[in-house]
Amino acid sequence: MNATPQDYRHLDVGPLLGNDSGMNDLLYVNGGNPLSGTITVRGAKNFVSKAMVASLLGETKSVLRNVPQIRDVAVVSGLLSLHGVQVEYSAADGVINLDPSAVESAHVAEIDAHAGSSRIPILFCGPLLHRLGEAFIPDLGGCHIGDRPIDFHLEILRRFGAEVDKREGGIHLRALGRLKGIKMELPYPSVGATEQLLLTAVRAEGITELSNAAIEPEIVDLICVLQKMGAIISVDTDRVIRIEGVDRLTGFTHTALGDRIEAASWASAALATGGDVTIKGAHQVEMMAFLNTFRKVGGQFEVHDQDIRFWHPGGPLRSIVLETDVHPGFMTDWQQPLVVALTQATGLSIVHETVYEKRFGFTCALRKMGANIQIYRECLGGAPCRFGQRNFHHSAVISGPTPLHAADVEVPDLRGGFSYLIAALAANGRSTVRGISLIDRGYEAFQEKLEALGADVSRG
Ligand code: EPZ
């Protein structure tokens, strides 16, 4: 069975095709119930989509396990299918089979229609340049949490020997002969740029060395996939990654690491609602920075082999000073859900966002719901970051505890959207959360999970 939009049964087909209808795109949330029970998180969105792209580099079939049924998987499946990859997905088993033996160029208009709201298309560059000698990458979507330029990506591709031609609607790339290994230092340890380099270097001629690389667990898992395919990659402790290019790669069989962002989101929901949630598929090693912070705020957790239990022990939560950072720091994607829980902590919490310059826009709606949050341009509470001199509102001071009340809110971005669900669950009264199809991008069956945890929610 080919992965078609119909396979993503609980998802709207419209958003998959970049055609939001707005129908039934809201959730009513009757707040006040502590979340309680057990849920499962499957593979990490920010790994699964990249591993799917990596399959393009192999000459044989790949099998990826623990794949969640989320819209980003649907978007990448669509793009791979357009390029001649046979994609078969069983949502129940979470297994995706990818056969790239008949890869071909796709029509520009179709690529555009399937790119949806994702940023993953930019990672098709290296694999397509190796397979076809050219690529067309549509203008990217993704969450509006900063400018999110792709200058590092384009610089990497140019240095490998690709001709990069910006056109209306996207970028056309052409390989001028076989791509050749490079030595490069990233200005910032960008996740996407590191992945771009990995997916390009593995089949380039000679050695590539990247300094100041990102080393997020999802990247390490991608390196494991590439090693299974036949790549030679070493990761040093000082953020240096070395790749020896090889002529051929095969397919892989791999089980995706769990989604630590989804796990932390549910943990924050447990804390904000005074609940007790066990998350199967959450792993300590990838969440250590989150677990430390969760404990400092006053939440409790218990790590088991297959799950982590998170709960609010009763009594007041504590305010904290927090700075987001690249791995092994506190992830930016954990920030938004946790901020909702911090509205319930006693005293002043300070959160300094150092990864994205505009990731506090979501706090407007929280203020509407009764939270006391002020946003500042200065780097508060930590070392100065690269946004300090640039006039961005990237520090927040949260004063609590403040009771939250119901409101009518519109999802601004993926993690901000989940944060609104948490706020609505913690609030008194019935909230309306609009634009929830955006949450489908990264949270598998979130309504079913909410219901399983005792939340009183219904679709509009
Ligand atoms: C990935 O985005 C994730 N997305 C993001 O998750 C995550 O927040 C981010 O990494 C950081 O962990 C996916 O994996 C699909 P970056 P990415 O390149 O790769 C700047 C979520 O909610 N930068 O590490 O796009 C950039 O502007 C999403 O799941 C450049 O300046 O992030 C940002 O400030 C949101 N030029 C910083 O680097 C470039 O060419 C980090 O971005 C590239 C990045």
Q: What kind of feature is each model-predicted range?
A:
Residues 2-460:
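Short, structured segments at the rim of ligand-binding sites
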